[in-house]
UniProtKB/Swiss-Prot annotation:
Its main location: host cell. The chain crosses the membrane at residues 169-189. It comes from Acanthamoeba polyphaga mimivirus. It comes from the Viruses. This is Uncharacterized protein R710. Disulfide bonds: none annotated. It is a single-pass membrane protein. Residues 77-92 have a biased composition (Polar residues). Residues 77-96 are annotated as: Disordered. The keyword Disulfide bond does not apply. It is found in: Host membrane; Virion. Keywords: Host membrane, Membrane, Transmembrane, Transmembrane helix, Virion.
Amino acid sequence: MSWHTGSNQDNKLFPKGKLSGSYAPLDIAFENSPAMNEFENRLCHNNPIISERSMSPAVSASYSNPEATSCGCMQTQTQPQHQTLSQHLPQTHHTDAHDQQKLSGIFYNRTTDAQNQFSETINPPPSYTVHNTDIRIPLNRQQQYPANHLGSELLEGYNNVGTEPCMGFWEILLLIILIAVLVYGIYWLYKSEK
């Protein structure tokens, strides 16, 4: 069987005639080949989140095996599938839950960030007062408006623009001009038809 990649780099990945372009079938990704082990090795070495328990045996052996090649990649070490599965099974539910909680706590525990955000020593409120009554966007707490503007209605998207009972002078003048233009346009159309 002949193989091709669409380029002259590595002629051992794709069967000729079965593929269009240089895309591999899905079973190549799960095959225990040197190319895929090298890819997984590089991925795991550059990703600090991955723990040693979740790595494949060839990659986890790279942490304990000092015989790496010159490019930093490990030689592939094949193991039977049942040994791979038994290594990945957790010993107890408690240790697995504890490790998961410890890992997620690093990235999702934001209580100290929230305390720093709402602490007045780190984020003091402004010393000036805001006299803006024409707030055109929903308020949020980071805009630091005074407390009388931080009602629940304003935080939910309510704005108080245009709540005065009568229209302003310029709005009335604009309305009169628009009505006059509309009447003149209707009159001009009526005259042009006759």
